[in-house]
Amino acid sequence: MTRALLVDPNFSSVPIGQALAQHGIDVATVGRKTSEGQYTNHFDIDYSDRAAMRALLQRERFDYLIPGCTDKSYESCSALAVDWGFPALDSPETFNQLYSKSKFRALCHALDVSVPRVFTSEQEALQSNAPVIIKPDDAHSGIGITRLDLPTTTTLSKAVKVAQDFSSSGRVVIEEYVHGQLHSYSAFLQDRQVHCAFHVAEYGTLNPFAVDTSYVLPTSSHELELKNCAEKIAHALALDCGLLHIQYLAKNSDICLIEATRRCPGDLYAMLVTRSTGFPYAAAFGAPFIAQPISKIESPKFHRYLIRHTVSRETFNLMGRDIFETGAAVEAWVPIANDLGEGVPDASRAGILLLPAANQADVMNVIAAIYGRGSALKQRIENRPSREER
């Protein structure tokens, strides 16, 4: 039987494993086991340990290597593919071109693709008199980020230090803060052209730099421009096939790209797209890694409004069943961790809510309710007793 190693055992990668199994492939997973794990054929190995991974591949002789929903997963697969020749995985150089914020911005600048203005020094940022945002060059998911509307020498230096602490390389990006609504453009490539793509509006209801709420848009006025951007990047980096997932800010007729990745987005993004459009997102993501063409996968068949909301453990514990009071019926509640006890960090996710909506206005009402609940949650967090007082 054909065998594949899925390099991510956590809940967001489950749809990928299920799609692979539908091809009759025997799927194993690798990674440090968590309470999210749902696989019996699992190797409890740190997949960032290249020596251990090489030993595993040498011993087990898998036919395919499949990245999951984390940057570290794709980075590990990229490095291993150099020696093992697994299909459709980017080289480490290509991975870094997208993963590094500074390299990605330089690439986009060379391709005449709009990205935020990058400052070469703290002094240049201060002299610009513009609002700035400071980010680790090689960390994602909203960590280590500071926004300064009126930066000073002191506040900017402090923000740079925070970003450096979250960067494995110690590098940071200081750029002009761009106002706009966050979106993702999730494009599947075949022969360096966009076969099909999805537009998703994204919100951070608790942390403005970390997405926890999103829904698929039926159309976008930026479709042609984004397609052009994606294909420019695909040709420049020789991305023949597979996913190119872009996050961008939109304001009126303007767009500004923020980052791009080739991994599958997490928090059941694949499920959101599939339930909203009928398109088998997880199957399309996995197809190139098992040498199957994306072009044979049918395009979306319909559109329905469905909101995805990620609930943290802290929210779950403080709000209880109030998390379901958003003004919408609950289509699905997908718990992430089997154990929500004291051993699970507050920042970890308790589960994913899927909330159907009748139309665009209904979507915005539900999201407003989620934002309102977030304000109530913040009050509860601020007013709750400290651990010493409990």
Label every model-predicted segment:
Residues 4-7, 26-32, 118-120, 132-133, ...:
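Short, hydrophobic beta-strand segments that form beta-sheet elements in well-ordered domains
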Residues 82-151:
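A conserved helix-loop-beta module that forms one wall/lid of the active-site cleft
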Residues 176-239, 243, 250, 261-289:
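ATP-dependent carboxylate/phosphate-activation module, predominantly the ATP-grasp catalytic core
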Residues 254-256:
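Conserved protein kinase catalytic/activation segment
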Residues 114-116, 133-134, 145-180, 199, ...:
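Conserved ATP-binding module of the ATP-grasp superfamily
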Residues 1-94, 295, 358-385, 389:
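ATP-binding N-terminal substructure of ATP-dependent carboxylate-amine bond-forming enzymes
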Residues 145-151, 188-190, 216-217, 355:
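Short beta-strand-to-turn element immediately C-terminal to the catalytic PLP-Schiff-base lysine
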Residues 110, 286-390:
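Peripheral (often C-terminal) accessory segments that flank ATP-dependent C-N-forming ligase machineries
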